[in-house]
């Protein structure tokens, strides 16, 4: 019996602590969690913004896609007009700072914190290697063109060569403008022997060489 009384008393005590705002007891926290062990600092929770709208606001600021400020509901005769803090300007500056922080973080993560205009040793080496590769590629293309021209020239030359070396009977020597010179006959005490063996040998050799000559 005593145990039941103690349990009932503790239950009433726990329920009495939630009677002021019973619905908010099981409400989700600012971080959209039923049981939130993080997010609280100094007894207060930081406001949770929707990341989708923050990204959209940054994009609009970067693209300069801003709506005009509407001051229709603002009293122009108010003495505090000059001391009013423009919320649009304040939000714009806030998002600009956020964008700058994002850019600095991305550069730090990518390892390019230095300015793009500064020429580093690694970038210079990459540029030199790229230029060298382009020059080698161009030289290789020129060499291929020269080889193709040489092959074509070789084929053209082979068309004018005769494999069996036949003498062309229609060949005529080129005409020159030189006047013929009449030399005096050579005096020889002994007449030529047309039937000599040496002369016949030279005639046969000339005939063999003439049969192997190429026609023009």
UniProtKB/Swiss-Prot annotation:
<keyword id="KW-1003">Cell membrane</keyword>
<dbReference type="GO" id="GO:0005886">
    <property type="term" value="C:plasma membrane"/>
</dbReference>
<keyword id="KW-0449">Lipoprotein</keyword>
<feature type="lipid moiety-binding region" description="S-diacylglycerol cysteine">
    <location>
        <position position="18"/>
    </location>
</feature>
<keyword id="KW-0732">Signal</keyword>
<keyword id="KW-0564">Palmitate</keyword>
<protein>
    <recommendedName>
        <fullName>Uncharacterized lipoprotein RC0563</fullName>
    </recommendedName>
</protein>
<keyword id="KW-0175">Coiled coil</keyword>
<feature type="lipid moiety-binding region" description="N-palmitoyl cysteine">
    <location>
        <position position="18"/>
    </location>
</feature>
<keyword id="KW-0472">Membrane</keyword>
<feature type="signal peptide">
    <location>
        <begin position="1"/>
        <end position="17"/>
    </location>
</feature>
<feature type="coiled-coil region">
    <location>
        <begin position="133"/>
        <end position="162"/>
    </location>
</feature>
């Amino acid at each position: 019996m005593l145990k039941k009384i103690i349990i009932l008393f503790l239950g009433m005590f726990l329920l009495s602590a939630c009677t002021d705002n019973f619905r908010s007891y099981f409400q989700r926290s600012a971080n959209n969690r039923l049981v939130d062990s993080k997010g609280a600092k100094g007894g207060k929770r930081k406001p949770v913004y929707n990341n989708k709208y923050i990204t959209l606001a940054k994009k609009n600021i970067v693209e300069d896609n801003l709506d005009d400020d509407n001051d229709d509901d603002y009293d122009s005769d108010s003495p505090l007009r000059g001391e009013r803090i423009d919320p649009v300007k304040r939000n714009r500056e806030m998002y600009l700072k956020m964008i700058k922080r994002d850019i600095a973080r991305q550069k730090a993560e990518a390892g390019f914190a230095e300015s793009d205009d500064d020429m580093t040793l690694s970038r210079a080496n990459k540029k030199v290697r790229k230029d060298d590769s382009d020059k080698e590629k161009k030289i290789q293309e020129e060499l291929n063109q020269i080889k193709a021209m040489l092959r074509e020239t070789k084929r053209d030359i082979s068309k004018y060569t005769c494999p069996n070396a036949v003498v062309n009977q229609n060949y005529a020597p080129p005409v020159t403008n030189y006047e013929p010179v009449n030399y005096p006959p050579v005096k020889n005490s002994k007449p030529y022997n047309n039937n000599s063996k040496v002369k016949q040998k030279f005639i046969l050799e000339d005939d063999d060489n003439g049969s192997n000559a190429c026609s023009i």
